[in-house]
Amino acid sequence: MKHPLVRNKVATITLLLGLLAATPGYSQSTPKFAVIPLTLSDNVSLPLSNEILLDVSVYDPDFVSSVLGQWSGIEVVGHRDGVLKLSISDNMTAVADAQSPHPQYLANTFVIDYKEASVKEVVSAFLAEHGKGVIAKKVGSSTSHEESKLESNPGEIGAKIEAFVANYITEPSYIHNFSFASTVAKSRSGDCTEYAVLSGAVARALAIPARVVIGTIIVEDDSSVEAIGHAWNEFWLDGHWRRIDAAMYSAEPLKKYYLPSHILNNEGPGYALGLSKAVLNAPERITVVSEKDR
């Protein structure tokens, strides 16, 4: 008999793949990025510090540890009985594994289809609003966003894209479709995945390497803390991966901790398999603990 955790993960992945395979067109339905059960141990109280200790129940602790090793500000100290013990900073950043990112993060893909007319219109609107930050090279008699160069501070450009997409999507929804960038550009609606694919499309159209990261975000406000399945971006700017999160733009005053599960590297027709990995590697439960608990 399968362990209950295994049964739950298999059922979720089966549902995910079935929905993706059965839904035609450019907008596929996926299961809800759920709220993940999170508790505070008796020795922990709010407000949380900039670095916190977590006990995270996961399906495959060794694999999840290898994924988390791609970011600094997250330290895995061990695991036991499917519970990963780690510390995480609210200033977590990706580790640069090369002087420049893989060309795939500039590609026009099935998911981040920035060469579609609807996305080009969004990019043009961005340039009209923030054109001073971008120089577009001339290719023949036309202007190519694909060969654009950054004129201003790289971090400033990332922040401008983040703010622009946050305001461009006028109908935030929780129906949890996984729509491609061109669909989001037309509908101007969606949840965190839609914000992420459109942000990635705008960045790539401006020759900024961009990728989508899927994982969990722990959000604290004045009186509570919760963990939610989430998607965000990382842009390659000034030799570093910088986190961009248009979906959480309005929540800037809140304290946030990002716990990645998967980088969406497969953006082709088989992208659903990548999403299934994200589901499999997602936390089942999270407990914020103290040194006394360990």
Where in this protein do the model-derived segments appear?
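Catalytic cores of extracellular degradative/oxidative enzymes
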Residues: 90-103, 182, 223
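Secondary-structure boundary elements
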Residues: 100-190, 198, 265-267, 276-294
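Catalytic cysteine-centered active-site loop
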Residues: 171-179, 212-222
